[in-house]
Amino acid sequence: MDFRYLPMTQEDEKEMLQTIGADSIEDLLADIPASVRDQGTLEEVGIPLPETDLIRTLSKLADQNMNTKQYPSFLGAGIYDHYAPAVVNHMLLRSEFYTAYTPYQPEISQGELQAIFEYQTMICELTGMDVANSSMYDGITALAEAAMLACAHKKKKTIVLSDGVHPEAHDVVRTYANGPGLEVETLPLVNGETAIANLDALEDVACVIVQYPNFYGRVEDLQALADATHAKGGLFIVSANPLALGLLEAPGKLGADITIGDCQPFGIPQSFGGPTCGYFTTTKALMRKIPGRLVGQTVDEDGKRGFVLTLQAREQHIRRDKATSNICSNQALNALAASIAMSALGKRGIRELATRNLQTAYALKKSLIQAGFHIVDDGPSFNEFVVELPIDATEAGKQLLQAGIIGGLPLGTFDESRSNQMLVCATELRTKEELDQFVTALGGLTHA
């Protein structure tokens, strides 16, 4: 045989074409303009390789990547370089758990349901909220779903976002809002904090969304923001870094109606930006409007504790037209990674890890100030902040890479007026030597 297997015979092809009413493959592709079809061949791919040669070739390609195992990283902005305890992968790769899906006969998989229930419980404890779902795709889609919930619950059409919320979250919310015709307004930052006074001029406000700490690393006064939002008749939504909540007051205790965020800091690798795991928490009053799946605890007919998927009438696979959301999946595997990491750390460990992040970032900030750099907002922050550079931050990033350092995010990516500013992050993984190396490299920047 010329091939290991025959994926499709001519008879198979003919039968399938007849079934769909096409005479040929060309008929099947008729709606695709010839101008956009690839007319070339795959000769540039080369001849098939033995597995050993293929692995060698791919390894050489992979070696061209610059990764955080080789170079110290000062890049954050939503995806962070944290240590994942070894127990995370040890447990995650067990056959009992190694699936991204909740099962279609869920009550059979009591172990998986218990793991999700424990994840929900820990997230509620961190955020100070009453109920959490089993997870969402990522923090930003959780934020957009929270905005949709607020508009449906309040029967209002204006979503208000602080400029301290991740710029890409603004884009996702606007995409979500476009279909149902919702309005999206923004509140600027003044001296690093959300200008809540500007809320007075807005009408029909369904919610106000802030980030905690905000995109630029600043820790804002949530209570004042919550009070102003509620006075306007809207829901107060907080996008919170869950690791920071090891030190900061829980949003639920400061007036948040919904707290969402991304669990990536807990045991989930950076992986070029995903996949991660979004968490979604809210109050009992909004429990029946929360998107996604909920695992609840109950007892069986013998009085033994058990776990079930509960309140499923909210979900689109039960009643599509009246569902609270069209999301019908979750990130159960990554949620499990987060819950294993949180369990391994414990309450004291999470606090100590958060403290280490805080101390490392402040040590870097102090060193940069001593070296003559300007910190754009020197207010309270967690593990990232903005530094003003003498040259374009994108060019600075290239020079840092040449020095063996992954630099921070050039803010000119989102705002041309901030082209010389870099959002710098320092996690618990950065050593004093690496901090000194970074400061020295910034001091040696030259104009291109």
Curated annotation (Swiss-Prot):
It is an enzyme of class 1 (oxidoreductase). InterPro entries: GcvPA, GDC-P_N, GDC_P, PyrdxlP-dep_Trfase, PyrdxlP-dep_Trfase_major, PyrdxlP-dep_Trfase_small. GO terms for molecular function: glycine dehydrogenase (decarboxylating) activity. Transmembrane segments: none annotated. It catalyses: N(6)-[(R)-lipoyl]-L-lysyl-[glycine-cleavage complex H protein] + glycine + H(+) = N(6)-[(R)-S(8)-aminomethyldihydrolipoyl]-L-lysyl-[glycine-cleavage complex H protein] + CO2. It comes from the Bacteria. Keywords: Oxidoreductase. GO terms for biological process: glycine decarboxylation via glycine cleavage system; nucleoside metabolic process. The keyword Calcium does not apply. Belongs to the GcvP family. N-terminal subunit subfamily. The glycine cleavage system catalyzes the degradation of glycine. The P protein binds the alpha-amino group of glycine through its pyridoxal phosphate cofactor; CO(2) is released and the remaining methylamine moiety is then transferred to the lipoamide cofactor of the H protein. The glycine cleavage system is composed of four proteins: P, T, L and H. In this organism, the P 'protein' is a heterodimer of two subunits. NCBIfam families: PRK00451.1. This is Probable glycine dehydrogenase (decarboxylating) subunit 1. It comes from Exiguobacterium sibiricum (strain DSM 17290 / CCUG 55495 / CIP 109462 / JCM 13490 / 255-15). The gene is gcvPA.
